[in-house]
Swiss-Prot record:
Active-site residues from the entry: 151 (proton acceptor)
Keyword field contains Oxidoreductase: no
GO molecular function list: ATP binding; protein serine kinase activity; protein serine/threonine kinase activity
Domain PASTA: 482-550
UniProt-listed Enzyme Commission number(s): 2.7.11.1
Reactions the enzyme catalyzes: L-seryl-[protein] + ATP = O-phospho-L-seryl-[protein] + ADP + H(+); L-threonyl-[protein] + ATP = O-phospho-L-threonyl-[protein] + ADP + H(+)
Domain of life: Bacteria
Family statement drawn from the similarity comment of this UniProt entry: Belongs to the protein kinase superfamily. Ser/Thr protein kinase family.
Region (Disordered) location: 300-403, 435-485
Residue ranges of domain Protein kinase in the record: 20-287
Keyword annotations of the record: ATP-binding, Kinase, Nucleotide-binding, Serine/threonine-protein kinase, Transferase
Listed name of the protein: Serine/threonine-protein kinase PksC
């Protein structure tokens, strides 16, 4: 969102029967404008975001926007811009939704980065890691409440005059993707191209790990002064997110230690399961890495480029459901978390094990290698390759001096790539991600997968505080696209005992698959299918499959 500071089109107007008096325009973007305002009831300054009039024409969208604002208002954290109120009012004869927010005296992170780039070429790594850790602290809170941001970028992060990080615009991207406005058609996604995760670019369902990818993009930008993927068109940028590998940040900024390269590389994995399992885990790693090296001024490599999208001309991007089937086989080099003793600190990829996968396979424990010497980590089971073709159920501030990266609506990018010389065909292979898992006998059946009945060395006990309310099952969220359907709740990271109580209250059926994993402890739900947010018919509720941790470390 650009910063203005002048008089906006609504300056001098009032909202909510005169309670909120709009003053200076603070910023304006593709979806909304933000004004400084005075709350005459509580005698304080606030910031008011008014959605552009074309977005408020349909009642269904306004209702979705209101519900999202209510959800965001429940988020309370030092690093989150508070939401005080929401409503709609007539401005220039048009119904205009608005949100009343905490007024942050400061400037966007993009402006802070611009200054660092002018002075040093990039932001110092220790400063960037601390800011990133604070952003992740905010996301940790929102993810625990089931709210995915969907549009993390420097323009949505504020820095106060005292250096406090504030993340804003939670829920705005989700409200935009309601599928009910004239601007948003089926198979379309909303976001900022430079920060989209591969699954967002593909129009697939997203979860907390999509935000972590966007945080990885932002961290790359902070420590290098440029974006890992940038091109002349949103389509080319989205193609790069799905198909291209980013350069190591140290190839741009020679002052960066290998641990920063490894941290960013993990955050930017195409397969969500190969990223950090949670905002908390990524935050801990940022702080660990920040404490592991001596801070040094950035040393930018002259002429280093990160241009992308060269292969987009040979790719076809039809709407979801209209793509040609991709050939079978692995999509990308399988994940191997064990570092090798050789010059490559990230290890030599090992063949992927063949196993059924439904959506996202189990995330194995992994820690970014230490800067020197590289710590030998315990190898985790290699997850199946991530299927980059659309699933059958298909859920629905740029670099300094760079191109505009305002939020735009992009066609869902199905990577049904035209085979050119056999090369593209080798890139896109179906890793079995759309195969159905073996059917279980009953709703409470449990299939044990490499689970050990005893507590192995490294065992982590259960965290029974991670609970889910029963009403998440008995009164689930109604689908935004079909009033006759509901959305599957988010059970990930919750304790299985609490989840079972939720299921029993609603009369739902589950299938539990035990997996060896000691990141969150015994009984923690690590994955689910259908994924959270999937639209289902409550009259024909499918069996929900849950991957649950045994608390034991992954077998070597």
């Amino acid at each position: 969102m650009s910063q203005d500071g002048g008089q906006g089109r609504y300056a001098g107007r009032a909202l909510a029967g005169g309670r909120y008096q709009l003053r200076d325009l603070l910023g304006e973007g593709g979806m909304a404008s933000v004004h400084l305002a005075y709350d005459s009831v509580l005698d304080r300054q606030v910031a008011i975001k008014t959605l552009h009039t074309e977005l408020g024409r349909e009642q269904a969208f306004r209702e979705r926007f209101r519900r999202e604002a209510q959800a965001v208002a429940k988020l309370t954290h030092t690093n989150i811009v508070s939401v005080f109120d929401t409503g709609e009012d007539d401005l220039d004869g048009m119904t205009t939704p608005y949100i009343v927010m905490e007024y942050v005296e400061g400037r966007p992170l993009g402006s802070v980065l611009d200054e660092d780039v002018r002075q040093q070429g990039a932001m110092p790594a220790d400063k960037a890691l601390k800011i990133t850790a604070d952003v992740l602290a905010a996301l940790e809170i929102s993810h625990e409440m089931g709210l995915v941001h969907r549009d993390i970028k420097p323009g949505n992060v504020m820095m106060t005059k005292r250096g406090v990080v504030k993340v804003m615009d939670f829920g705005i991207a989700r409200a935009m993707q309601s599928g009910v406005t004239s601007m948003t058609q089926t198979g379309m996604v909303v976001g900022t191209p430079q920060y989209l995760s591969p699954e967002q670019a593909l129009g697939r369902g997203v979860d907390a790990r999509s935000d972590l990818y966007s945080v990885g993009i932002m961290l790359f930008q902070l420590v290098t002064g440029r974006l890992p993927f940038d091109a002349d068109s949103p389509l080319a940028i989205a193609y790069a997110h799905v198909q291209e590998q980013p350069v190591a940040p140290s190839a741009v900024n020679r002052a960066l230690p290998p641990a920063v390269d490894a941290l960013v590389a993990r955050a930017l994995k195409k397969n969500p399961n190969e990223r950090f399992p949670s905002a908390e885990a990524m935050r801990d790693e940022c702080l660990r890495v920040a404490a592991s090296f001596q801070a040094a001024p950035p040393s930018i490599v002259p002429g280093a480029q990160t241009s992308s999208g060269a292969g987009v001309g040979s790719a076809v991007f039809p709407p979801v459901g209209q793509g040609t089937p991709a050939p079978t086989g692995p999509v990308q080099t399988p994940y191997q978390p064990t570092p090798s003793p050789g010059p490559n600190p990230y290890g030599t990829p090992a063949p992927a094990a063949h196993s059924p996968a439904y959506g996202y396979p189990q995330q194995a424990g992994y820690q970014t290698p230490a800067p020197a010497p590289y710590a030998q980590q315990q190898a985790a089971a290699t997850p199946p390759p991530y299927n980059l073709t659309p699933s059958a159920q298909g859920s629905g501030s740029g670099s300094p001096g760079g191109k505009s990266n305002k939020p735009v609506i992009i066609g869902s990018i199905v990577v049904a790539v035209v085979a050119v010389g056999g090369l593209i065909g080798a890139l896109l292979m179906n890793g079995g991600g759309d195969e159905d898992p073996e059917a279980g006998g009953g709703g409470s059946s449990t299939a044990s997968v490499s689970a050990s009945p005893s507590k192995a060395a490294g065992y982590r006990g259960p965290d029974k505080e991670k609970t889910i309310e029963k009403d998440k099952c008995t009164e689930p969220q109604e689908s935004y696209n079909d009033p006759d359907k509901i959305q599957v709740p988010d059970f990930t990271f919750k304790y299985i005992g609490s989840v079972k109580e939720c299921f029993n209250a609603a009369g739902w059926q589950m299938k539990v698959v035990e997996v060896d994993e000691n990141t969150y402890g015994e009984g923690s739900v690590r994955d689910q299918f259908p994924t959270a947010g999937t639209d289902v018919d409550p009259e024909n509720m499918p069996e929900i499959q849950l991957k649950v941790s045994t608390g034991n470390p992954p077998s070597e």
